[in-house]
């Protein structure tokens, strides 16, 4: 058989070999096509098409050196053939000879309108950092008649991200999904939509905070649940749900919510709140661990220091407590609201007075309680003011302050009891008796009634009760963070970048930019935006394997510190 085949091959003409070679080429049987073209060229080597077809078959066999030799032969015979130049450009591209490839492909693109050609020119332009040119080629590739080159459109979308043009990138990716719903850009589009929904939720979150302040806790819960329906990863919504559960003394539920916040965003603020809740659940060790974790994540977290100060105060470890109150007073609190700053300073100064025995701290605390009363005519703040006067031995002003508290909340038992103690110490025994009698009419509790009856018996016998007003440090209101809009955006900027999502980070940074006025910070924002553009491009290249650049993370952290934002 081999002998017969050899004889048969010798009898074949040039035309026979070309016909057979063309058949194999059309069928994609490139190795056979190469054999036949070589046989044909042995008989006649002056037809440039044969050399071109041989080069084409070798190209598909990834034999690029031989393919280059063949296409060079074709070009020797027909140097102006644009299709030969096109194939030579492709071969150089595969050989990694980018400059030569660009030269021939660019020349070919003047006459050949081919989606693959434009896409490769786009790829080469990207390699040399000519992104505007690359975008032009990718869009040409996609917009070719009957083109379905979604890959080119995807690459165009990535360059839009590199330019920081989120809207055009979103439109490009959406167009891809209309034709291929399972395309890898689906994750990117979902990310963009989720971020926009989260940003739009700020007004709802702010309304929820207002409701908490106004003690409309159920209304606030509804708001935060609404936000979670829109953005299931709204860590801040779970934080406020935890706060509400803590206010209602449902500490296990509060712990569940704050753990959910932490699972979404490993944030110092949330560990401080977890410490508060664990302490109220009786887990002192767990609380200390949570507070220390908060401080490790952010050494400027006043809530963590305050939680530790209160914990050690109630344990009777006054030196430790005093040191942590110092930390609160030393911490720069720019991000916090005026109300939060005043409350933390107020209780910390009272704490310093009671852990050191230095009365001057009470005097310093007075200006903060006055500020709080000006912000909100609350019975709590009038009560604290009365307590401070009481500790300073000023029973007259303590009486006036407690009376002001009762004008806001006439049936508050703690205030009535404190008022009675002040009256007794002022020598106004009959008025103290009247006040205790009033308490009996309000409270319907056998144990409490017996306690008051014993006090009344002593007072009527003109015997001292030796009662003291308990420290306000045993009745701290639930503390929680109320971020302004800039810090809300800033914390989310950090969250998204820390969670390897530069697109979300870039969108939040764009919103922060409109609230920045300082030139120094504006320059930093511009620098980070530029780096995030590159990170977005890299993210689209890697998707699931992407990891945020540590240097960009550190720069974002520095920006947050300059903005006074607490993580």
From Swiss-Prot:
Swiss-Prot/TrEMBL TPR repeat ranges: 14-47, 48-81, 83-115, 116-148, 150-183, 199-234, 236-268, 269-301, 303-335, 344-379, 380-412, 414-446, 505-538
Keywords in alphabetical order: Repeat, TPR repeat
Classification lineage: Archaea, Methanobacteriati, Methanobacteriota, Methanomada group, Methanococci
InterPro entries named in the record: TPR-like_helical_dom_sf (IPR011990), TPR_rpt (IPR019734)
SMART domains: TPR
Protein's recorded name: TPR repeat-containing protein MJ1428
């Amino acid at each position: 058989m081999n002998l017969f085949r050899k004889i048969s091959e010798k009898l074949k003409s040039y035309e026979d070999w070309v016909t057979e070679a063309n058949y194999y080429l059309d069928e994609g049987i490139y190795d056979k096509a190469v054999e036949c073209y070589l046989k044909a060229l042995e008989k006649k080597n002056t037809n440039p098409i044969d050399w071109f077809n041989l080069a084409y078959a070798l190209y598909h066999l990834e034999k690029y050196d031989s393919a280059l030799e063949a296409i060079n032969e074709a070009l020797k015979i027909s140097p102006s053939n644009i299709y030969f130049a096109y194939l030579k450009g492709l071969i150089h591209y595969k050989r990694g000879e980018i400059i030569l490839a660009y030269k021939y492909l660019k020349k070919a693109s003047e006459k050949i309108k081919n989606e693959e050609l434009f896409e490769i020119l786009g790829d080469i332009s990207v390699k040399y950092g000519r992104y505007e040119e690359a975008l032009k080629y990718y869009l040409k590739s996609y917009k070719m008649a009957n083109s379905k080159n979604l890959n080119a459109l995807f690459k165009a979308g990535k360059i839009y991200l590199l330019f920081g043009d989120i809207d055009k990138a979103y439109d490009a990716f959406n167009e891809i999904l209309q034709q291929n719903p399972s395309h890898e850009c689906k994750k990117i589009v979902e990310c963009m939509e989720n971020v926009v929904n989260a940003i739009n939720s700020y007004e709802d979150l702010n309304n929820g905070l207002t409701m908490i302040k106004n003690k409309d806790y159920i209304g606030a819960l509804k708001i935060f649940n609404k936000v979670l329906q829109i953005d299931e990863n709204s860590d801040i919504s779970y934080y406020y749900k935890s706060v509400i559960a803590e206010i209602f003394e449902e500490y296990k539920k509060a712990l569940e919510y704050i753990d959910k916040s932490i699972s979404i965003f490993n944030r110092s603020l949330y560990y401080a709140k977890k410490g508060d809740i664990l302490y109220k659940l009786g887990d002192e060790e767990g609380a200390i661990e949570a507070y220390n974790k908060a401080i490790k994540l952010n050494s400027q977290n006043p809530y963590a220091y305050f939680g530790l100060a209160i914990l050690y105060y109630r344990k009777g470890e006054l030196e430790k407590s005093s040191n942590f109150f110092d930390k609160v007073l030393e911490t720069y609190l720019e991000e916090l609201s005026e109300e939060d700053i005043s409350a933390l300073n107020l209780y910390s100064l009272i704490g310093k007075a009671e852990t050191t025995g230095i009365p001057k701290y009470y005097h310093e605390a007075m200006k903060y309680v006055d500020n709080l009363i000006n912000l909100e005519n609350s019975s709590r703040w009038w009560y604290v003011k009365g307590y401070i006067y009481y500790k300073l031995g000023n029973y007259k002003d303590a009486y006036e302050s407690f009376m002001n508290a009762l004008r806001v909340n006439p049936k508050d038992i703690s205030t009535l009891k404190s008022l009675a103690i002040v009256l007794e110490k002022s020598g106004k025994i009959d008025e103290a008796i009247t006040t205790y009698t009033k308490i009996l009419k309000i409270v319907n509790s056998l144990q409490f009634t017996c306690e008051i009856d014993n006090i009344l018996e002593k007072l009527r016998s003109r015997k001292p009760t030796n009662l003291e007003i308990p420290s306000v440090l045993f009745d701290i209101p639930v503390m929680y963070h109320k971020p302004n809009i800039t810090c809300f955006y800033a914390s989310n900027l950090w969250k998204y970048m820390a969670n390897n999502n530069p697109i979300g980070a870039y969108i939040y940074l764009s919103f922060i930019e409109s609230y920045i006025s300082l030139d120094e910070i504006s320059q930093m924002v511009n620098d980070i935006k530029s780096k995030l553009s590159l990170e977005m491009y890299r993210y689209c290249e890697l998707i699931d394997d992407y990891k945020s650049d540590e240097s960009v993370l550190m720069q974002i952290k520095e920006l947050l510190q300059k903005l006074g934002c607490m993580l």
